[in-house]
Amino acid sequence: MSAWSIDQARKTYSIPHWASGYFDVDAAGRMVVRPQGAGGPAIALADVVDDALGQGANMPMLVRFPDILGDRLAALQSAFAQAQADWEYTGGYTAVYPIKVNQHRGVAGTLASHAGEGFGLEAGSKPELMAVLALSRPGGLVVCNGYKDREYIRLALIGRKLGMNVFIVVEKPSELKLVMEESKALGVEPVLGVRMRLASLGAGKWQNSGGDKAKFGLSPRQLLDLWKSLRDAGMGDALKLLHFHMGSQISNVRDIARGMREATRYFIELSKLGADIDYVDVGGGLGIDYEGTRSRSYNSVNYSMGQYASSIVQPLADACAEAGLRQPRIVTECGRAMTAHHAVLVANVSEVEAAPEGRVPDLHDDEPPVVRHLRELHAELDERPAVELFHEAAHHHAEGLSLYALGQLDLVHRARIDDLFYAIAHAVKARLTYDEKSHRPLLDELNERLVDKYFVNFSVFESMPDVWAIDQVFPIVPIERLDEAPARRGTIADLTCDSDGKIDSYVENEDLDSSLPLHELRPGESYRLGFFLVGAYQEILGDIHNLFGDTDAIEAKVEGDGYSIVQQRRGDTTDVMLDYVGYALDDLRASYDAKVAAAKLPADESARLREALEAGLTGYTYLDDSPLE
């Protein structure tokens, strides 16, 4: 094995392939963040966490870097500017942020602070619209998607009265009647968009957000009926935006090109009917390479941001040239690409359950045959082919488990079976190599079987729900000690009392594996892991399984060559979570007091118990982050 180095650490955790220039390892073996991109100052993530802990924050902790949000937005705008220059496209471009991706004020507000025609906001519900109306600047583009009732439409029209460039996107035929009635009542001319349901389908975990099975959008017949209704009402000039959605996290750039070919036909045909379409909103789809493989895997993408922009601009440029049409302004809703990189969850390991090492127990006269067979196999390790020997050992191990279940082996011999089997497994693994093709399947099996369990102070369901819900992959890296070779392999489990509260796939060496190289814990020292690219959707979708709530969250902003912590938000406490599920806090306290009184303990002990109960009621929902001794 080659000597460990910082470059080896980068390669092991595939950092250059998913980091997009925002994350790296410094010479001291610490994960560093470059919030302004590859050329900007490097900030040690461990320093940020330690500073936040010193200011009263707790682990686990979500660390936000708002500068990354600005850099991602600038990169997206730059990619489209270059693509439009390449294809002589003069229609312009607006990057719209759909706040459903992450509605937190620090995220949406940071993005909304970027003024100009090149940025806008999208809402998909009444609460989101209320936030967008507050965040948007005069003249700012606001796209109103989602199901709409009369109040939603009224609020959107009020936005126009307040000077915002609000588009009400008709997603269902019934919405048009409400728009007509409310615009007349308010005395404001509506500006409309229409969402088409494309037949083209991009492969991926979210493929049904596009295509014929899409939840939203009009069919071709419904589009014709809508246009007729607008013309009959003298409102044909109100339709200014064509919207469609090809899917989310599209992995293959060819799927984007195919969807755009279909979408441009709708643009041309609507224009032929007399519609004056000024904006084409292509929705989302720009994916993130979570696993760093640059492939068509659902957790990856096989294209760059520049290639994505070109795949949008070129078909529209060609369509306009073919039909002799004015080039419309292009709008995207690439919220995942804007936000995923900006947030890192940092959590400490609370305990490690080591993989069984196995041992050869002392020989006993009363050993049953199954134990004796395993002992003999261990003695033959240097004399027989390793793969053949292991399969025979696995057979005897399974036989022993069956005998124990039938009551034909006692607990002592059951333990000896495990001791011998795992001793054989470790010895066989040491004799295998990936260079030998016939060894690879067994080596994969043993790498999955002979791993430690790292119990980490967080909840998968709260902080990374997509891991549980759709087998999403996120890069995971120790935030320090990367100058040391990791001596163990481990899997990660959370604090919840749920067998699904674990992570099964890990980014390693430009691939995915069932375990991750990790370090041994040191007594008295915290071992902290960073969970990267969690800035899109995860906080918003997180649930309160086992009543684990929001984690503490901080924002670290670049200042010169350093940083400052500009905001700190305390995570949920136990009383907040209990109140959320219907427990009256006064009733809880009264119940505790009654039970303490009924215990008839000495006054000083009763006081200590009441104090401990109150501390438990108002404390953080996660574990104390003190390192193990």
What are these regions (language model features)?
Residues M1-M31:
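Charged, compositionally biased N-terminal leader segments and the immediate start
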Residues Q8, A74-Q82, R105-G109, L129, ...:
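Short alpha-helical segments and helix-capping/turn motifs at coil-helix boundaries
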Residues S20, V25-Q103:
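Low-complexity, highly charged intrinsically disordered N-terminal segments
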Residues R30, A38, I68, N102-H104, ...:
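Short, glycine-/Ser/Thr-/acidic-enriched flexible segments
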Residues R64, D71-A83, G91-Y93, V101-H104, ...:
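Secondary-structure-rich domain cores
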Residues D67-A75, D225, E262, S311:
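A non-catalytic, amphipathic alpha-helix used as a structural packing/dimerization or gating element
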Residues E88-D281, L286-E291, N302-Q307, P315, ...:
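Active-site-proximal beta-alpha core segment in soluble small-molecule metabolic enzymes
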Residues V313, A317-E629:
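Charged (often Lys/Glu-rich) extended helix/loop segments that serve as interaction or gating elements
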